[in-house]
Amino acid sequence: MCIRDRSNSALKAEKKALRTAADGLIVIAQTSEYSALAEINSETDFAAKDSKFLEFCNEVKNHLEKNKVESAEALNNDFNEKREALVQAIGENIQIRRLDLVENDGSVGTYLHSDSKLGALVSINIDNVDLAKDLAMHAAASNPSCITQDDIDKDVLEREKAIYKKQAEESGKDKNIMEKMVEGKVRRFLEEVSFVSQPFVKNPDQKIQELLDESGASIVTMSRFKVGDGIEVEKKDFASEVAEQLQ
């Protein structure tokens, strides 16, 4: 790419960088040493289906299979020029938003949904790839927040407790009954968000912990990316969207 074209690409990419990119695709790369999960964002689903965007995502995947890149920042640096050129070609903000890399100690299972907008990695401490794959599929489907109940973020737990306490107080019941109401709701909440406490998606009569116990396995790490998770999207009318695309 010549200096002038490079300058134009960089300028356009800089202008569009502040625009919300909450669509896109998930890519998964696996080697004998590690597995990687990355989210690559575009502004619209239309752009996410563009052949140039798909080619870019495939290049990122191939790069991750050949290079042990351990942060989204480093991955962005590796692809900055190509990303800027893609922004110029497609006319949308394109970002490599996040990356998670897991060492292949024990077994690592991966799951990528058919639309490539949801992916998961789960590593376990034993050599059982089929189990790891089942767990990755479960993580994608059930969206656990933590591996065990002890791993739940304390601020999240306290916020939930406060909500349940307020609900109990509004019930007007006796104090001891209200305490039991809160305890019951907290217990159910922890069971719902904890990986090992959830019913296994392939066999709802069995908890994940029971599945692990059958093989003497434990979950080491869990990572789940859904395209656009946590990104606040501003509602715009059609005319505004068209005008913005022309900038």
Residue ranges and their predicted role:
Residues 4-247:
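N-terminal assembly/interaction segments in proteins that build large macromolecular machines
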